[in-house]
Amino acid sequence: MSGPAASDLESRAKAAQQLAHAPYSKFRVGASVRASGRTFDGANIENASYSLAICAERTAMSAAVLAGARDLEEVAVCTDASPPSSPCGACRQFLYEFAPDPAKVRVTAINGAGERRSWTLAELLPDGFSGRELAVSEPE
């Protein structure tokens, strides 16, 4: 990511991190995705029944899908970790589902200290599995 749009995506991920509900792990995550030219935010939301927690990347992409924005373009993730944490495996797979070309989707991880790491979604999930392998197309 580069330029003002990237800065906006990263700023939104930082703001979303402040809204995380992480009373158990204390690991707050914020995410912002650009899909179909629009931006959507999410934060991790934990639950006392740990398996019911949902990650920031999935809350952001779910908001995009609900708004009809399904073509993933970029992702920014903000954590307090050093170095910044990449998305977990479940989030990588979830995001891959909505990437028209995973090699062109930039995923940037940042933290409050200004550290930054960046990959393509294809680098994070090589040989990923999607509806393309199932020869499934979404209804028009």
What are the roles of these predicted feature ranges?
Residues 44-58:
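Compact, glycine-rich, soluble single-domain proteins
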Residues 35-38, 111-113:
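Short acidic-glycine loop/turn motifs at beta-strand connectors
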Residues 37-47, 71-75:
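Glycine/charged-rich beta-loop-alpha catalytic/anionic-binding loops adjacent to active sites
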Residues 26-36:
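Short beta-strand scaffold segments in enzyme catalytic cores
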Residues 63-68:
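Alpha-helix C-terminal capping segments
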Residues 13-16, 56, 60:
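Stable alpha-helical structural segments in soluble proteins, enriched in small hydrophobic residues
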Residues 2-22, 69-140:
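C-terminal binding/interaction regions
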Residues 55, 59, 90-93:
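Short amphipathic alpha-helical face segments that pack within enzyme cores
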